[in-house]
Amino acid sequence: MGQKSNPIGLRLKIVGTWDSLWYANRDYATKLHEDLLLRSFVKKTFHHAAVSKVVIARKVDAVIINIHSARPGVIIGKKGVDIDRIKQKIAKMVNHEVELHIVEVKKPDLKAVLIAENIAQQLEKRVSFRRAMKRGVQNCLKMGAKGVKVSCAGRLGGAEIARTEWYKEGSVPLHTFRANIDYSCVEAKTIYGIVGVKVWVYVGDSRAVVE
């Protein structure tokens, strides 16, 4: 039942890898909780910087954080002032030295999380859900995606009864393990209640598996 499982978790080590690159013999739960707090902090602090992914690695005496963003200039700030301030805040949270790296996302329209966040923002501004979905799908296909599917669930357009509507173009093979599928789920907080936005982006087969 490929449609019932998270496409990213299903393909770990086949197509992608984990976002937390460390191992711990003890205090594993504490470190994992720390990771969740760090991701939440980065997302909230740079909510306007189009952050697609936060990868965390750990050394014995340091925490290395790679922030993947479509707008790196917003994170760095003038002469790197903002990034130094954030470094100090994170260092206090984890009680370790912090290395912060900013990775630029070249094609933000191919990242499922950024597409979902963009659609959610439009829904919060009371844009028609059909228009928002169609625009997101078309922009993604223009950037070279082989297939995109977008689903919106909730009180769409202020309807009394919640329902799910979806829009799909191209191919999205959820049952093919070698298929490189990016997936994201975001909540839009509208005046009628929460609307769930899910996005699947198929960018092609993984070269490593094909070879």
From Swiss-Prot:
The keyword RNA-binding applies. The keyword rRNA-binding applies. Keywords: Ribonucleoprotein, Ribosomal protein, RNA-binding, rRNA-binding. Residues 38-106 form the KH type-2 domain. One of its GO terms (cellular component) is cytosolic small ribosomal subunit. GO terms for biological process: translation. GO terms for molecular function: mRNA binding; rRNA binding; structural constituent of ribosome. CDD domains: KH-II_30S_S3. It holds the Pfam family KH_2. Binds the lower part of the 30S subunit head. Binds mRNA in the 70S ribosome, positioning it for translation. Belongs to the universal ribosomal protein uS3 family. Part of the 30S ribosomal subunit. Forms a tight complex with proteins S10 and S14. This is Small ribosomal subunit protein uS3.
